[in-house]
A protein has these predicted regions:
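Conserved catalytic or regulatory cores that recognize and/or transform ribose-phosphate-containing ligands
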Residues: 1-139
């Protein structure tokens, strides 16, 4: 299964950990943005290149996972995932659930019918998404 993980730069290590579990189990990361990290100071051409790569990767993924909280890019990617969702799972994860319950932290798109919201410790998310269970319900 092809997957994409979106999150803020501050959560890049969690994205790497989750991607490692999924790739070790035979799944394909459509674009590993954690390899280049923050590119905002690298100029307009580089940012354009990364933007195209990330849009294509989100669109091509069969499963999209957003680790919340995320930044502007994460929320843009959530929108792309919802808009291109044919045969795609769109999973939003929050350790505390605050992003889904606190008005100053939530977003209307978190409640789109195509979205699966998951609240649990990160280690539990990893277990839920482990290869043998990747296609089963996470509810």
């Amino acid at each position: 299964m092809r997957f994409y993980i979106a999150t803020g730069l501050s959560n890049a290590e969690m994205a790497k950990t989750l991607a490692g579990v999924l790739t070790r189990n035979g799944h394909e990361f459509t674009y590993n943005w954690t390899e280049h990290g923050d590119i905002r100071s690298e100029g307009e051409d580089r940012m354009t290149e990364v933007a195209f790569s990330e849009v294509r990767a989100v669109r091509d993924a069969e499963m999209f996972i957003a680790l919340l909280p995320g930044g502007c890019g994460t929320h843009t990617e959530i929108g792309i995932a919802i808009a291109s969702r044919s045969n795609k799972r769109v999973i939003l994860w929050s350790e505390t659930g605050d992003e889904f319950t606190k008005p100053d932290r939530c977003c209307a798109f978190y409640f789109h019918p195509a979205v699966e919201r998951i609240c649990c410790p990160f280690e539990e998310l990893i277990s839920k998404l482990d290869a043998d269970r990747i296609d089963t319900s996470l509810s």
